[in-house]
Amino acid sequence: MLKVYNTLTRCEEEFKTLNEKEVKMYVCGPTVYDNTHLGHGRTYVSFDIIRRYLEHMGYTVNLVINFTDIDDKIIKRAYEKEKDPKEISEQFIKVFLDDMATLKVKPADIYPKVTEHISEIIAFIEKLIEKGFAYKTEDGVYFEVKKFKNYGKLSNINLEDLVSGARIETSEKKKNQKDFALWKTAKPGEPKWESPFGSGRPGWHIECSAMSSKYLGEQFDIHGGGRDLSFPHHENEIAQSSAYSGKDWVNYWLHTGFVMVNGEKMSKSLGNFVTIGDISKEYSPEILRFFFIQRHYRSPIDYTAESMNHVKNNLEKIYNVIENIRISLEKSEKSRTWDENEFLLYDILKNSKNNFYNAMNSDFNTVKALKSVFEVSNGVNKYLSLTKTPSEGLLLKALDFYKIIGEIFGLFENYFKESSDSDEEEFVTFLIELRSDVRLQKNYEMSDKIRDGLKNLGYQIEDNPKEGTVFKKINI
């Protein structure tokens, strides 16, 4: 039974979808005015793994990730760069999508943009005014938070304790400084759209309510985002959407933890801002994904050079196990009689697989799930060290385990995809044989060139006095 931690109730709950075997999921996308950073990467990789696991468990997932392509930050950046706001937003939408592809994050089903949903947003605001939850002023339209009785439930904030101006813009036109903007009256030189409330543009929070309702309906299963969005953004979304429909809006609220850099919160002011573009030059996508799953998605994670080296070494160990299985399959036996070593590895595979699913069913606990992966790796290594002619069936079961792990965590994909490419391996074998010939002729310069060329193709070769030259895939 799958359980997920719901920020709204602050406890783990049994996961029940509105429609059988269908998950409607909305994850807040970026405000596209700058490069994608490590915090973005952590959030979207985390929800990618959640989505992959749900799909692995037989659910059809309809995922929506929005783009906030008009906002104060975008307008400010456009002014600084002397560019049109649309040019800025389109530039960084491309950066985001490219970075997500680099991180092997599966594309969302829908990427709605705010500027393409102005009519839906206006209609949403009109209904809130009609129902008495919003009011017009000279500088826009505001949601009256006192009218919504459950305001603050998600973030556990008491309305009376809110300090005016704390993450909520102040305005003399508001009835209450805790009210938030649904529509902002246009200022000179800013992008604007016509509406019944005058020329202007949407506030930040209303966009997600309008777009999620269009694509997922008035009620859906999962709403996700970074922990920093729980207030005011998600709190305001709940108020708007529930006031609009009169229904409970979202069943499960999931939030990812912060990314720290050397023990400090990542920020531009501290000079420790790490972009996906920069870090991808140093570490492969699989190392980054493996780094993110070292901590539970709700917990903070600390990015340090030491932690990344530790992650890289552990991932290499797993890849070595997978490669050793591939090599050992060549000398395995289909009809081998099992002895205690086979029974021991079989039990490890069976128990570890069960433990993996139990961990993932407990709010997608990747930390505990990884323990199962290392248990299998240790078991396989021990088995291969004790057995000269291993069981083919057992080795294939072990490979199948790693393939399942890879599909869910977004790892090993190139290995399993390419390992079936016999033409490539035949070519590599030919190059290794050619290298052996030139080594016999003592042409070590050419031998080294072939070795380096194979490394560039993703293969590491080892000269073993007993077994001759063997090759291994380099996947990270």
Curated annotation (Swiss-Prot):
It holds the Pfam family DALR_2. Its EC number is 6.1.1.16. A motif ('KMSKS' region) lies at residues 265-269. A motif ('HIGH' region) lies at residues 30-40. SMART domains: DALR_2. Zn(2+) binds at C28, C208, H233, E237. GO terms for molecular function: ATP binding; cysteine-tRNA ligase activity; zinc ion binding. The keyword Electron transport does not apply. Its cofactor is Zn(2+). It is found in: Cytoplasm. GO terms for biological process: cysteinyl-tRNA aminoacylation. One of its GO terms (cellular component) is cytoplasm. InterPro entries: Cys-tRNA-ligase, Cys-tRNA-synt_Ia_DALR, Cys-tRNA/MSH_ligase, Rossmann-like_a/b/a_fold, tRNA-synt_1_cat_dom, tRNAsynth_Ia_anticodon-bd. Keywords: Aminoacyl-tRNA synthetase, ATP-binding, Cytoplasm, Ligase, Metal-binding, Nucleotide-binding, Protein biosynthesis, Zinc. Binds 1 zinc ion per subunit. It catalyses: tRNA(Cys) + L-cysteine + ATP = L-cysteinyl-tRNA(Cys) + AMP + diphosphate. The keyword Transmembrane helix does not apply. ATP binds at K268. It comes from the Archaea. PANTHER family: CYSTEINE--TRNA LIGASE, CYTOPLASMIC, CYSTEINYL-TRNA SYNTHETASE. Belongs to the class-I aminoacyl-tRNA synthetase family. This is Cysteine--tRNA ligase. It comes from Methanococcus maripaludis (strain DSM 14266 / JCM 13030 / NBRC 101832 / S2 / LL). The lineage of its organism: Archaea, Methanobacteriati, Methanobacteriota, Methanomada group, Methanococci. The gene is cysS.
